[in-house]
């Protein structure tokens, strides 16, 4: 169940951080919000600047490091009782996208032009340790300790360092599209999301990656509560959810306002917390899994054109008989229900533009395949 937390936010919230005791930090635009009671009450912290917070890193019991669109680093060591800021790189030249401090003194920032910055004095000064200058972007970064880390780029590959950024190894993923987010739930196991809807997984600290789900749209924020259970958000408020370490996935609508997107999601004290483009914050519990996606069955389930205008073709294996085609809108309403044939042409000219879910089920309601598509006119 997705429950909206009443915060008074009216602007985009890009990042969520969690202290070890479960206290929440939600940042975006020029205001930071802080809650010590699971989102029931909030304290607003003005950053006194004109730049948006893009990403943050929580370290220890009291410290937070935040990067902004103006190439500034904001730092607190006492839970926002005091704040300091420092310059990183060159504003307007290399944008900052992700930050990770494995310890209080050592931190890394990933950014545009495939650049990585490093600080060894708690964020006061920064050195450029990787700059490929190819026009691409490093979208996310994660360090296991002060020396061993990984960053993801806009061409579907990773860079790994074992010596604090002195040298880097290029690691390819199964994809060629931007890798939006990476999260490691143990020292070895991690997941990554892509702008083309795929999800990939590693079991060896990012040295090798395998595709575990080919979805649609763009998968974004990754968050796992433990090795078995986790979220990966998708376009237009939809999300994927697994309870078996990514072997199977559910696909459902989150309940955010139509057209809004979930930008970040974090787990704390038994709940997931999600931040949205319109400033809404959701607290998530008692998850219901309506359908399960089996990737091997999806291989024979195709829908085109995508985006659609007036009709869609739905194709699946000819030996699939006695099936139904269900199409749902982004609010979860069933808008089309009909018998499935191996090659269906379905009229959608009476449906408005937007994101839709198409599933193939038997007469008992068991889902055998599912995909998404958009209608655009």
Where are these regions (language model features)?
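Entry beta-strands of beta-propeller and related beta-repeat scaffolds
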Residues: 22-26, 62-66, 105-109, 147-151, ...
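Blade-level signature of beta-propeller repeat domains, shared across WD40, Kelch, NHL, RCC1
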Residues: 261-289
